[in-house]
Amino acid sequence: ITIFDLDDIKELNNTDALFPNNWVTFHQDNTAVIYPMMAKSRRKEKRNDILKYLEEFESFRIEKVVDLSYLEKDGFFLEGTGSMVLDRINKIVFACESSRTSINALEVFCKKLNYSSVVFEAVNDDLPIYHTNVMMSLGQETAFICSESIKDQKDIKHIHKLFGISERKIIELSIAQMIQFAGNVLEVENTKGQSHLIM
């Protein structure tokens, strides 16, 4: 498993810079997408020098950059794979609406990358969950989800149905587990093509 260790620019004091997935994602068609961030302080994390550095490696080819940062001026935000859980195989975005996840911005993403979307409300203590990846994550064969955080039973049934169609094993998380970020799981692949779940 290859890990890229990138240093932050100390003078910028970006305390959340260890979450680059909120400002950039990379896709199989060699597209990179840059996202509109809600917190003005976090917008400094977006760095073209990082994209140029990654392009030096054979495993990273960037042929197209889709920059959605312009949506920030209209108050529309979409914080990468924090806001969205991507089913990259079936081109479906799962997203719970929040102050950091605007439907307008999500629609722009879906149109530009040819995804369909499943939008729902998810809460903890009656407050919207700020990022979808807190309560859900997808691997090729697994789906971690905190169903009890989803307000509408119809949404739960629809999401579970989609997981079933894609033959993913559903792993249910409790609210307590979600609060401890048990839903924030990544699937990575090593050089032998073997998948691993990390958290």
Where do the protein language model's features map onto the residues?
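The feature marks the mature, well-folded catalytic cores of soluble enzymes
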Residues: 1-199
